[in-house]
Amino acid sequence: DDCCSAADRHEVLDNWKGIWSAEFTGRRVAIGQAIFQELFALDPNAKGVFGRVNVDKPSEADWKAHVIRVINGLDLAVNLLEDPKALQEELKHLARQHRERSGVKAVYFDEMEKALLKVLPQVSSHFNSGAWDRCFTRIADVIKAELP
């Protein structure tokens, strides 16, 4: 499968360990918020989906908690890249969750990828954007498959 090959998965996992490992817990909120800021800069309409978690008050605990939940979902997906069956089950679960949320659109996942590809290289010394593009596409394609 050349869409997120074994080499790509290795690169993504290696990059991710350097970004999201336990030693960096203090910066997780900042990284997550930077990703969302970039998403909202790309598409201000995406903000509307997050009204119930205080998106307009980035210093509020409920927004920070939501940011961490989203990035932890990415963390889980990235760490399941080597286990395709478990990954598929997790992505189906995430797809269901996103289908049930009013206003979530497939295009937001494309924009989230652009945001990730802009922010993550700033916190990873050897970021492989090609591998991330291919593997995030594999993840996002399942989640957004039934979204408008």
UniProtKB/Swiss-Prot annotation:
Residues 3-148 form the Globin domain. Keywords: Disulfide bond, Heme, Iron, Metal-binding, Oxygen transport, Secreted, Transport. One of its GO terms (molecular function) is oxygen binding. The keyword Transmembrane helix does not apply. The keyword Disulfide bond applies. Heme b binds at residue 98. It holds the Pfam family Globin. Disulfide bonds join 4-135. One of its GO terms (cellular component) is hemoglobin complex. Disulfide bonded trimer of chains IIA, IIB, and IIC. Belongs to the globin family. Giant hemoglobins of worms are formed of a monomeric subunit and a disulfide-bonded trimer. This is Extracellular globin-2B. The lineage of its organism: Eukaryota, Metazoa, Spiralia, Lophotrochozoa, Annelida.
